[in-house]
Amino acid sequence: MRTLEPVSSDLMRESQYLREIMGLDPVTDHNRIVYLDTCFEFPWDTTRALELALFRTFAVPSVAAVLDASGEFDRRAQKRYDDTDLILSTIVEAGYDSDDGKRAIRQMNRIHGRFEIANEDFLYVLSSFVFEPIRWNARFGWRPLVEAERLATFQFWLEVGRRMAIKEIPATYEELQRFNQEYERANFRPTEEARRVGLATRDMFLAWFPGLPKRFGAQAIYALMDEPLLAAFGFPRPPRPVRAAVEASLRTRARAVALLPPRRNPRLRTRRKTRSYGQDWQLEELGPA
């Protein structure tokens, strides 16, 4: 079982967003809490955590087999990343029951409907969207998530899962966390499909930094992975000094961010210039042709 490693309490800066969150109900106000966390408090951390969450799902043989057979990662890894990012970001930024949120979920369901995916696999992917941001922030965020934020994250993705028609979603945070951990122990294992998808995803990330030596960049990516994930992809264990350096740099960043004033404007990923589309895209056009 992976345990959370809380950052020091001296990183707990006060912000108007945290004050607002502490006054909200994590069940009835979960849309607002997740929006504040994703777009104001932790935009960079949430993105990195969800990237790692998606990486973890590829270690599941049945998921990797579907993705590998589709050819999307081998030929269009960046487009696949941008499609996923824009759909999920729309749901978070607009809210799952807004017009755009409903369109995003409808498009996501249309894409998934082309493949034979087990309910348990859907449920694991959903659980990774809940727990990877929580784990990331506990290790590398400028503050860990408070209980209201953790419960709101669970409630938000619970509601998204219901709108995706995912069945048998655990009713509590603790039950979903237990499912997440038990599922990984039972299902993570090396396959050729997982290796191909993992390599394609790794190389996509490395392409973002063309001036960085590939060997060093790859080791930095491996340093963010635990042993079961490395084994599932057949990736080498990074040298201990590399892992220590990567973790130290992320903690240094956290301390620097903690000294900055709260963000004034939301960081909206749906407004950013994507590598695949620029800023010209429509929800209904995302996904495989």
Feature-to-residue mapping (PLM):
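Mature, function-bearing regions of proteins
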Residues: 1-289
